[in-house]
Amino acid sequence: MKFYSFKGYSNNVGFIKFIAATAVIISHSFPLYYGNNDKEWLYRFTFGQATLGRVAVWIFFFYSGLLVTKSLMNKKNEETFFIDRLKRLFPPLLFVVVCSTFVLGPIVSNLSIEQYFSNINTWKYLLNGVFIPIHNLPGVFEKNIYPNVVNGALWTMPVELICYFVCLMMYKLKLLNEKKMPLLGIISILVILMITFIFWNLNLDVVVSAVLACLSFFTGMYVFVMRNRISIK
């Protein structure tokens, strides 16, 4: 069948996302317990080139690029596109940030309630709610391998927001079509690979992860735009 028959929430997308989420949990358990990924299954199999968690993030961003582009091109409503995206991101993000700050923090912190709420880092953590990654809560998980770190996976939120913005700009510039997408795809991949190579050599793993996530999102965009030429057996 042709890929244009893709329905978004059918085709086992939900199940695939569940598997990816499980892979993230399993993958993160290794560095949280051992302090590094040396014993993580995929990390060992690929000689340190990938982890289950990283591949799972690629899957999430791929489907995000696919579904977001589908939504934008079908509705063709630029004015509400970004607002609709924020409506999907903000409620769960704010729930996690608020619960972590005002419920989890006071319960598990080694500091007293007064010390906890008088610490500036407690309030800085709320910046996660506006897509500024701050991972530390004072006195929380101090004896862990990564002390004070809470919800480290929230780094993906601003990256996804940037991807939404790029998708919208490409739509406004009329780049999301079968004629322009292949050349644009080649150029984007070359630029992203060059950036990844530079930062990989500098050992900036977070930047590399963000760049590869963006590449996955763009791949999802590309697949949807070129859906009429893609056959699935």
Task: Name each region found by the language model.
Residues 1-9:
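Short, Lys/Arg-rich, polar N-terminal cytosolic tail immediately upstream
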Residues 2-3, 68-85:
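Membrane-helix interface linkers and caps
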Residues 11-72, 90-93, 97:
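Functionally critical transmembrane alpha-helices in membrane proteins and complexes, commonly lining
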Residues 13, 77-81, 89, 156:
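Alpha-helical transmembrane segments and their helix-entry boundary regions
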Residues 21, 54-73, 156-176, 185-233:
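Specific transmembrane alpha-helix
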Residues 36, 40, 74-75, 105-116, ...:
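Transmembrane helix-loop junctions in multipass membrane proteins, especially transporters and channels
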Residues 44-52, 94-161, 165:
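Membrane-interface helix-loop-helix regions
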Residues 83-96, 171:
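Alpha-helical transmembrane segments of multi-pass membrane proteins
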